[in-house]
Amino acid sequence: LLKTDIGDAFAEFYRRDPEHGLEHTPFKGFIQCSQEAVVHGSWIGFALRPKTAAWNYVRFHSESAHCEAMGVSEFLQVKERLVHTGYQDDWIPEFDLTPFNREFPQLTESRSIGRGVEFLNRHLSSQLFTHRNQGQQFLLRFLQVHQSRGRPLMLNDRIQTVSHLYAMLDKAQDFLSTQPGGTLWTEVAHPMQSYGFEAGWGRTTQQMLETLRLLSDVLEAPDHENLAHFLGRIPMIFSLVILSPHGYFGQSGVLGKPDTGGQVIYILDQVKYLEKEMHDRLWNQGIDIEPQILVTTRLIPEARDTACDQPLESIAGTRNAKIVRIPFRNPAGEIIPQWISRFHLWPYLERFTLDAEKEILAILGGRPDLIIGNYSDGNLAATLLSRRLKVTQCNIAHALEKTKYLYSDLYWETNEEQYHFSSQFTADLIAMNAADFILASTYQEIAGTPYSVGQYESYVTFTMPRLYRVINGINVFDPKFNIVSPGADPDVYFPYTDTPRRLK
């Protein structure tokens, strides 16, 4: 029984016999937080969600009214037996990923879900304050490893200890204070390098001073706001790869074709503003490196009047971003010419990722600094690629199919030929746990509302009978979850008072 079925049954019972007075008792609250009920023999099991992302399982005996707690696995087994009468498998794999998160800091308040970066900045600043010497050593090592294609950034090998860093910070700030605020890095590079500092602190002496003072403040008295500002000024991303294998990915003539819609527009807009942001940040930090963005998708020989058969395509409105297309191949190595549904592409993704890796390394001349996956297939490809290249991985789901199809996990076998949910849900589970951070558009996407389950939350506990059951698949309190709303294109949406930009 679903939440609505349980609520309707309670309402009907109260309508028929209002004398019981259950309307104003704790039992009504119990019914309201019941998400699901299963009936097995004389027992009725309930999955309770008393508040956002909090779950409990209990069961009642219909004759004795005895109530007791149920284990997650036990509740899932009852569901399995309802789908397959008499089914019993004591050896079905169970997945509980809780132990893998024990050593990592976790959020505790449901209102904080999706604010992972803010939480980690607070946690890190607290650690820097509590373990002063260890934290300062960590910051020093962090700054020492920064480089781009062999070019050192931030610090050179003249600074080897924290005490030396303190001394050189004072000297560098004293020196920069004597220079005009608009003096460029190129004009002060030699003396700054003699102190142990490389490019990356700012383009002008004023910007360099601001960044150096932020570092001094962080070293002296760590504060999460100063730490966030300082980290935001450090150049870390010079090149990135965006993966979106399915559909017809192109800049024109693709919308309306199978598996092709809003995700394409989202990524193309994202690329334009990501490149601009990357360029501006690098420029302001005094680094003359052109950022590179590669959108990696599938090459489709039967392109149906689109550019999806072109291996390389520049993205309009960008300085240097490109679409890189890699074909799907069968086990014999032959290119698959026709479009393939997003539900049927799973056998091709591993070979696609290996081929994409070679092309990406050739174009970029090295590893990217960040890999962003999109949708289930792109996120799995991002997982495979990031593990091979040892690069930070970001996931963007766009839509998780599990919540779009009612009981798609429980009845996966019925839909397997058409949708291959067994592969997709497994890919989702792997990718979301492997990701370094996950971007969601809204809080509801992660943890739902007080009355509905979130898309990611639906992966916490579920079963696919005769395949495997998940006791704890993902922790929505993990700080890897971050909410970043898509926003709006300022070239399209602007104040009505800006009349010169309006169409005549």
Can you say where each PLM-predicted feature lies in the sequence?
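Catalytic cores of nucleotide-sugar-dependent glycosyltransferases that transfer UDP/GDP/TDP-activated
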Residues: 1-504
